[in-house]
Amino acid sequence: MKSKILLIGIDGLNLDTGLENAPTLVALKEKGFFTPITIEPPTWSGPSWSTILTGAKHSQHGVFDNSFTGHKLLHHPDLLSRAYYQDQSTTTFAAAGWPPLVDPIGHGPIIHERREQAKALRHRVLVRDGETYGYTHVDAEIAAAAQYAISHHGPDVSFVYFCGVDEAGHAFGSIGDEYRGAIARIDAYLDNLLQAVQARASQEEPWLVVVTTDHGHIDEGGHGGDSAKERASFVVAHGVGRKNPLWPQSFEPHQLVDLLLAERA
């Protein structure tokens, strides 16, 4: 049976700051595959997530900031779309509170709309607006919807995104209690999602749970530059009901998509 893939994006996570507040992520890191990766500058969410989710470099997808001006994303399908094109029995799910990732109205989206598959219930998308309503509230909605989707639909390939950590980093810096508290909150959501995956895996469904981030933060909060802290990212991958992936110990952010698709081949 093909592995089901759950890719979780935690925006703006400094791994060296928050691990003591993230027991679920620590456990995944210790039991699974782990490697640090280095983000191509500029370290904004737009270009970084475009690269991570499509496998195209900045110069290819044309996203260089969060305005998405002049982007070429239509020519670079995302992970979920490519998984479907690879096998048209594939079901996909995406949930995010940062609209450019999933909202067809406005900037982007990085995750293609795929209306025909959506009508056929093969592609489900939850769009929320954390920029307007705040990510503390929106991330909770995203987590609940993703847990429901995993438990009741078991999509073959999913992308679930949280931005509360990044929001706290901008507002309070990345070394204070507020940032650590946001990490703890997202880690609790991660635990809920993992429990849903484990329940599915107990029915002989193999799952691969992958966690990554798009950039780090400087201590006082902020990113966009080319410092080591801003460019620091990672990939954690843990097999549930299957072995951990045999991936190279060093790779570039744009190579993650192909590694994930190979797990579905």
Label every model-predicted segment:
Residues 1-265:
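Feature captures the catalytic ectodomains and active-site-proximal regions of enzymes
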